[in-house]
Regions:
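Membrane-embedded alpha-helical bundles of polytopic integral membrane proteins
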Residues: 1-220
């Protein structure tokens, strides 16, 4: 399980990072679009559709993303959209935690399918908008998620249910523990200090570099 996670992460990083640091935002936008299309195809398979139906689900997700791109939404704040989307996400997650796996089965299949495609579309739009805000901002968000997941995974395996007797969400994911939550939280706190210090050092180093370069240029003149 761990080896598969590592291999998958390395392959994705080899594709994602060059696109992320490319001067133009187009390659990164297309890479993320391909990932979301694959996710929509898989969502179609999980929803019980065959190959053709799942491809249609992926095409619908690509169409939504492409329309948003063509309309220029990747450069617009879209405050109302994010408020509604975020609110529905929180309410839906709270309901699923309460209802558990049996509650998921009570949702109509068509509604589950549409909700999944919309979630993938919003995820694409959010990530692409974050890239337009700057590489440093988006990279900090991605690393935060990676660190939280890694620390939670190892903390859960090492200390799961040693200090608390109640699992995190047994009705949804029986293997998750509160020790994993605290481990992920600790990892994020450490990352915050390290990232802030590194960011401050980098921002200070760049003006210093250009100052020295200007001084040398003045001396040569």
């Amino acid at each position: 399980m761990l080896l598969q996670r590592v291999i998958t992460a390395l392959v994705l990083l080899a594709i994602l990072l060059p696109a992320l640091f490319y001067p133009s935002t187009v390659p990164f936008t297309l890479v993320v679009l391909a990932l979301m299309a694959a996710g929509a195809w898989e969502w179609g398979r999980l929803s019980g559709y065959g190959q053709a139906g799942s491809l249609a689900v992926g095409a619908a997700c690509v169409a939504l993303c492409g329309a948003s791109w063509a309309l220029g939404w990747i450069d617009q704040p879209l405050t109302a959209l994010w408020i509604v989307g975020g609110g529905l996400w929180v309410l839906g997650a709270a309901w699923l935690l309460h209802a558990g796996v049996p509650g998921w089965a009570r949702i109509p299949a068509a509604l589950r399918l549409v909700a999944g495609v919309l979630a993938l579309w919003l995820a694409w739009l959010a990530v692409v908008q974050a890239r337009h805000l700057g590489v440093n901002f988006l990279l900090s968000v991605l690393v935060l998620v990676w660190v939280a997941d890694i620390f939670a995974y190892f903390a859960g395996r090492a200390f799961g249910l040693r200090f608390t007797k109640n699992k995190l969400a047994p009705s949804i994911s029986p293997g998750k523990s509160w020790e994993g939550v605290w481990g992920g939280l600790a990892g994020v706190v450490v990352l915050a200090f390290v990232w802030t210090a590194a960011d401050a050092h980098w921002q200070a180093a760049v003006p210093s570099f250009y100052s020295r370069l200007a001084q040398q240029g003045g001396w040569l003149l």
